[in-house]
Regions:
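Extended, compositionally biased non-globular segments
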Residues: 130-156
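Cytoplasm-facing juxtamembrane segments at the starts of transmembrane helices
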Residues: 33-54, 71-74, 90-115, 154-156
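Aromatic-anchored, glycine/proline-accented short structural segments
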Residues: 77-139
Length: 156
């Protein structure tokens, strides 16, 4: 929405963008606080990536907001949170309790964060580092492939 509004009024689009970022950070902070307070590894689901890593979506529209420092900070925040969560999530999925059938659709979210970080990085940084691009691309392809294979095995 903010992106489209910038075509008519840059300031209005920027205000909406900043408000959305602040609201997202508040919701993500609340989510992290409440989940950390009573943390149980077996309660972790791939959908837990949405609040902390979803902020990287702001990078995709950030290039039109003329705020490169904020866009870079948002990317780094989302990417660091993803790097913290990924090993814990993989450990939970491999060694934790089996995900209940009603929660299996949430497993498909596993493929999104690496792809989102790649899209955010390519959009936020005008001269992306090829090593970072290669790493994020390989990670996105690997995890998405694992999700597809797992979905096939789950259905069978």
């Amino acid at each position: 929405l903010a992106y489209i509004i910038t075509y008519f009024s840059l300031v209005s689009g920027q205000i909406i963008w900043y408000v959305a970022i602040i609201l997202h950070l508040i919701f993500a902070g609340s989510f992290i606080y409440h989940r950390a307070k009573d943390f149980d590894l077996n309660h972790m689901l791939p959908s837990w990536y949405v609040p902390p890593v979803g902020i990287v979506v702001a990078c995709v529209t950030g290039s039109h907001m003329h705020a490169p420092i904020i866009t870079h900070a948002i990317f780094y925040l989302g990417f660091i949170l993803y790097c913290i969560m990924l090993p814990a999530m993989m450990y939970r999925l491999v060694f934790g309790d089996r995900i209940q059938d009603a929660q299996l659709p949430a497993f498909a979210v596993m493929g999104a964060p690496a792809s989102l970080c790649l899209a955010g990085y390519l959009t936020a940084f005008p001269n992306p580092n090829p090593m970072i691009v290669d790493f994020l691309l390989a990670l996105a392809l690997m995890i998405t492939t694992l999700v597809y294979i797992s979905m096939y095995r789950i259905k069978a």
